[in-house]
């Protein structure tokens, strides 16, 4: 907006606001018609932005895709890392629904790996022509200080994931200290206020 030519007259156009209105008012947008099947089957590990995008465009190429997601819902970090006040769940689900309308198959609560009870890559290779791995970045980062594993200390990823799962921590009357000052830290701080924290400090 700082480069908007309108600044030469008065003020810039509210580009973000216009985009938000456009998305909110667009209504239902049907999925494109997919071409005749190529007969190829592709396994996609991970139901986040990357996996869902790959599934969508592969379906538009005529390939049959199956998304394997270890959690209960699709969306990845869009659901489990971004609070609903920033990305309304209804808008996210609308986009996911359009992707699914192309014929994407989904297997929720299905993990792929080498542990007992998990699907192995070898099993997928036998059934599918190709595998796309889109497992995302869901691991939290430790800062290496004393007490970071103490009771009452929780990582931002774990905190926001719980909210995404609908398991809202009860912070009523509590004091919360958020270490960090980036976007994720702000999400945690603002979510803590919404969860009833008496005081929230960002350090």
What are these regions (language model features)?
Residues 18, 78-129:
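N-terminal Rossmann-like dinucleotide/flavin-binding domain of flavoprotein oxidoreductases
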Residues 24-63, 78:
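Extended interfacial segments that mediate partner engagement and assembly in macromolecular machines
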Residues 135-149, 154:
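Flavin (primarily FAD) binding-site architecture
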Residues 9-14, 50, 59, 84-91, ...:
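Catalytic cores of large soluble enzymes that bind and process phosphate-bearing ligands
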Residues 1-22, 66, 70-73, 103-106:
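Iron-sulfur cluster-binding cysteine motifs and their immediate structural context
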Residues 132:
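N-terminal Rossmann-like NAD(P) cofactor-binding module of classical short-chain dehydrogenase/reductase
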Residues 44-68, 108-125, 139-141, 158-203:
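Rossmann-like dinucleotide/flavin-binding elements
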């Amino acid at each position: 907006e700082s480069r908007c030519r309108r600044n030469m007259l008065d003020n810039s156009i509210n580009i973000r606001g216009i985009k938000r209105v456009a998305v909110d008012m667009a209504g239902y947008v049907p999925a494109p018609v997919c071409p005749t099947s190529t007969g190829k089957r592709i396994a996609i590990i991970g139901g986040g932005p990357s996996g869902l995008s790959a599934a969508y465009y592969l379906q538009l190429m005529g390939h049959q895709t199956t998304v394997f997601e270890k959690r209960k819902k699709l969306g990845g970090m869009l659901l489990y890392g971004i609070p609903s006040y920033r990305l309304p769940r209804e808008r996210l689900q609308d986009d996911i629904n359009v992707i699914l309308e192309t014929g994407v198959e989904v297997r929720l609560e299905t993990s792929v790996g080498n542990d007992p009870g998990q699907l192995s890559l070898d099993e997928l290779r036998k059934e599918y022509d190709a595998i796309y791995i889109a497992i995302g970045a869901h691991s939290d980062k430790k800062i290496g200080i004393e007490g970071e594993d103490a009771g009452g200390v929780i990582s931002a990823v774990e905190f926001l994931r719980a909210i995404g799962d609908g398991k809202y921590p009860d912070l009523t009357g509590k004091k919360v200290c958020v270490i960090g000052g980036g976007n994720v830290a702000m999400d945690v701080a603002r979510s803590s206020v919404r969860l009833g924290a008496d005081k929230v400090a960002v350090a």
